[in-house]
Amino acid sequence: MRFGVLISVFVAIVSALPLQEGPLNKRAYPSFEAYSNYKVDRTDLETFLDKQKDVSLYYLLQNIAYPEGQFNDGVPGTVIASPSTSNPDYYYQWTRDSAITFLTVLSELEDNNFNTTLAKAVEYYINTSYNLQRTSNPSGSFDDENHKGLGEPKFNTDGSAYTGAWGRPQNDGPALRAYAISRYLNDVNSLNKGKLVLTDSGDINFSSTEDIYKNIIKPDLEYVIGYWDSTGFDLWEENQGRHFFTSLVQQKALAYAVDIAKSFDDGDFANTLSSTASTLESYLSGSDGGFVNTDVNHIVENPDLLQQNSRQGLDSATYIGPLLTHDIGESSSTPFDVDNEYVLQSYYLLLEDNKDRYSVNSAYSAGAAIGRYPEDVYNGDGSSEGNPWFLATAYAAQVPYKLVYDAKSASNDITINKINYDFFNKYIVDLSTINSGYQSSDSVTIKSGSDEFNTVADNLVTFGDSFLQVILDHINDDGSLNEQLNRNTGYSTSAYSLTWSSGALLEAIRLRNKVKALA
């Protein structure tokens, strides 16, 4: 299979650079090397996606430190956000970005029969997580109440604390890490007979899955339980307050870990996880959180900023969070999957805004290049005018793909109501062709397997493809993805080879392939 070829190619180009000795000099160790003899073919989307899956995986793995990998200017298990060391300097490991990266690695692991090369990379990440948890930092220390230091957002690549000014704390990181590692434990049990792959290696801080649960997952969960109702900075590291994305990933981490805690006879903690997850679910959906705003009929990412009249609340985080917390084919008690009408309306309104906001989108009638939020002014090198982000655009493609996958795989109907009507009627199907008397105030159910259902499903896939076409039009010739594309010219800008960008595209291609396999 192509994955095996990719791993062979990847191992063959392992960098000969030595590990750093003495004070960290990150600029002395560039880690970027373009995919060998590859140039993007822009003539056909299908051909591009077929080839790009391996290319995006290559660039994602290139930014992870592990013995079989190319990047070795870092402790094994380190994930750099980007090789970029200036304008902007992203040569650090973020707790959030690393966890999201390894969620993508886990998708590949699960689709490739527990590939041991990837499993080793995951376990090195788990080992590094143990050490980072216990590294005192400006946010606090492991020994503080509820492990306060776990809210530290980023560290140097050698595992030392970053002590510069930053937006602290960031409470989504521990939740995402706990979820990613918990998911790996389930993979180990279901795909590898409960056996870890690094237990005989030196300098590893665990010898069993129970060690991982008790010493790495549980502290992160204790942090979430202790601080879920405290303010922190958002995933974009700009605003302190309450955040839909943060609360959603926290709820996911707690709910997902209940059965794991029970499996290790930690019943009392499992009960605490369950009760706190239920409290968070109510907080997410109710008036206390303020995230579901019926006055504007969309999810508000940061209600505090809406109250201050500094933002309208539209944000790509309101669909990125649902995608990260609802893996395909997974039965989940976490609310706000992408079929939620408020998630879809938020997605639709951001798309409508960005179509007018970014002139690069004048070339597109359906999908578009999507930014973080309408009021964004960060261009990667200071503040002026915000740009579309490749990762936000790749996640935008995933939304319609997941709608189709979930409906088809479970033979579910598709329900259109007055909240999500505008999205479906404008971009997916003229609802008057289904029911000539249909009004936007009505609710209509499109029955699974019907001709109308198949039309809607096909059109949703085509709509998702229109976002990937935007990426094809603006991706670098070597298949790497920057953080942003210029709002006017479409040229790549900001940090190059952003790990999260490659991961988001890889997940979009994976989801699209699974939808196609259902046809």
Curated annotation (Swiss-Prot):
Assigned EC number: 3.2.1.3
Extract one GO molecular function annotation from the record: glucan 1,4-alpha-glucosidase activity
Q: Enumerate the InterPro entries for this protein.
A: 6-hairpin_glycosidase_sf, 6hp_glycosidase-like_sf, GH15-like, Glucoamylase, Glucoamylase_active_site
Q: Where is the active site?
A: D234, E237
What residues bear carbohydrate chains?
Answer: N115, N127, N205
User: Which keywords has UniProt assigned to this entry?
Assistant: Carbohydrate metabolism, Glycoprotein, Glycosidase, Hydrolase, Polysaccharide degradation, Signal
- Write out the catalysed reaction: Hydrolysis of terminal (1->4)-linked alpha-D-glucose residues successively from non-reducing ends of the chains with release of beta-D-glucose
Tell me the residue numbers annotated for binding substrate. Answer: W166
So which domain of life are we looking at? Answer: Eukaryota
The processes (GO biological process) annotated in the record are:
polysaccharide catabolic process
Top enzyme class: hydrolase
Q: Which GO terms describe its cellular component?
A: fungal-type vacuole
The record's PROSITE patterns line, in alphabetical order, gives: GLUCOAMYLASE
Q: Which PANTHER family match?
A: GLUCOAMYLASE, INTRACELLULAR SPORULATION-SPECIFIC, TREHALASE
Q: Name it.
A: Glucoamylase GLA1
Q: Upper taxonomic classification of the species?
A: Eukaryota, Fungi, Dikarya, Ascomycota, Saccharomycotina
